[in-house]
Amino acid sequence: MPFRSNNPLTRDELLSRFFPQFHPVTTFNSGLSGGSFLIEHQGQRFVVRQPHDPDAPQSAFLRQYRALSQLPACIAPKPHLYLRDWMVVDYLPGEVKTYLPDTNELAGLLYYLHQQPRFGWRITLLPLLELYWQQSDPARRTVGWLRMLKRLRKAREPRLLRLSPLHMDVHAGNLVHSASGLKLIDWEYAGDGDIALELAAVWVENIDQHRQLVNDYATRAKIYPAQLWRQVRRWFPWLLMLKAGWFEYRWRQTGDQQFIRLADDTWRQLLIKQ
């Protein structure tokens, strides 16, 4: 249920008001975006989440709640509470592995997601690319970065192949291997976009795994694999710029050195793929 409040609650206020019988169990700090914590009462568990980006508008957090509210429970956690700066969702029991599942299994999950009703808001990358440029450390802004940004602005985003609801942050740490199948967590970047954009954004281990994932998806979607791969490749410069810009943005926000290393690595990939 959504709950409106002008003043954000503290963690203790949240628990005492809405979950008085629950107690915190553990904190999750995995991933690049931040942490959440687990609460429990008599075997029932919920995950309590906060916005990963403290500077993002509250509307972005609300969109995540709305996305989870309309997704089937077989692929995503069901939300139970939304209010300013807090969201409470089901805990998904299962294993989070350090590597991606079989490409055919992952393709099946993504294809099923892409058959769901659209969320109602579009993913547009150019505003994000420009935001990350503006909000990055001025000392890190380069002529090459600006040149690539102008090039993409002039080229415009690739034409859509198929418009579907997307997760947009598919990597091993966001996949729960449950008894009933694969499920996705961390839906903060979800929105409607090109299916090829989703496939391009998957954090794969190598090009062979990426090609196999696209081929397996193409079989399910009844698309020529070569056609789908070409569309995926069209999104590569956009995705690499998005990742590099996000890492730069997070570096300025947090001062965490891991973001500088990741940004530098992504810039190198971008040069290779140009």
From Swiss-Prot:
<dbReference type="Pfam" id="PF01636">
    <property type="entry name" value="APH"/>
</dbReference>
<comment type="function">
    <text>Catalyzes the ATP-dependent phosphorylation of thiamine to thiamine phosphate. Is involved in thiamine salvage.</text>
</comment>
<protein>
    <recommendedName>
        <fullName>Thiamine kinase</fullName>
        <ecNumber>2.7.1.89</ecNumber>
    </recommendedName>
</protein>
<dbReference type="InterPro" id="IPR011009">
    <property type="entry name" value="Kinase-like_dom_sf"/>
</dbReference>
<dbReference type="GO" id="GO:0019165">
    <property type="term" value="F:thiamine kinase activity"/>
</dbReference>
<dbReference type="GO" id="GO:0005524">
    <property type="term" value="F:ATP binding"/>
</dbReference>
<dbReference type="InterPro" id="IPR002575">
    <property type="entry name" value="Aminoglycoside_PTrfase"/>
</dbReference>
<comment type="similarity">
    <text>Belongs to the thiamine kinase family.</text>
</comment>
<dbReference type="InterPro" id="IPR014093">
    <property type="entry name" value="Thiamine_kinase"/>
</dbReference>
<dbReference type="GO" id="GO:0006772">
    <property type="term" value="P:thiamine metabolic process"/>
</dbReference>
<keyword id="KW-0067">ATP-binding</keyword>
<keyword id="KW-0808">Transferase</keyword>
<dbReference type="GO" id="GO:0009229">
    <property type="term" value="P:thiamine diphosphate biosynthetic process"/>
</dbReference>
<keyword id="KW-0547">Nucleotide-binding</keyword>
<comment type="pathway">
    <text>Cofactor biosynthesis; thiamine diphosphate biosynthesis; thiamine phosphate from thiamine: step 1/1.</text>
</comment>
<keyword id="KW-0418">Kinase</keyword>
